[in-house]
A protein has these predicted regions:
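A generic local structural motif
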Residues: 8, 58-59
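Secondary-structure transition/capping residues
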Residues: 17, 32-33, 49, 94, ...
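Alpha-helical residues within the helix-turn-helix
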Residues: 40, 57-58
Length: 116
């Protein structure tokens, strides 16, 4: 992933609503979510939602498809994985492996309301 694409992606995610929308879409899975449903969950009016979704699209983090009269948005998992890979690619590279455990995958935090 090119540095400019990483900067664009991180810049797009550097806003409370865009980060929340992106996390919602990642959680939703590849089938995505209709714009109206995203707006309802986020409590955003259509114009604000469009603004934020367009920023995520420009950064390549979100894709849009038309299904009949609805616009369906979904996270682009390939781009997400490239971004994470870029950020962790050289993790502890200069330490001679002394901090390899720190560079491992993050443990998931337990979901609220679900049994552990």
């Amino acid at each position: 992933m090119k540095t400019t694409a990483v900067i664009d992606a991180l810049g797009a995610l550097a806003h409370e609503y865009r980060l929340a929308i992106y996390r919602l879409l990642v959680e939703q899975g590849p089938e995505g979510l209709a714009a109206g449903a995203i707006g309802a969950r986020m409590g955003l009016v259509p114009s604000s939602l469009t603004f934020h979704l367009q920023a995520l699209q420009r950064a390549g983090l979100v894709t849009q498809v038309r299904a009949s009269r609805q616009l369906i948005y979904s996270a682009d998992y390939a781009v997400m994985n490239e971004l994470v890979g870029y950020l962790t690619d050289n993790c502890c590279g200069a330490s001679g492996g002394a901090c390899d455990a720190a560079c491992g995958p993050a443990t998931r935090s337990p979901k609220r309301g679900r049994a552990a």
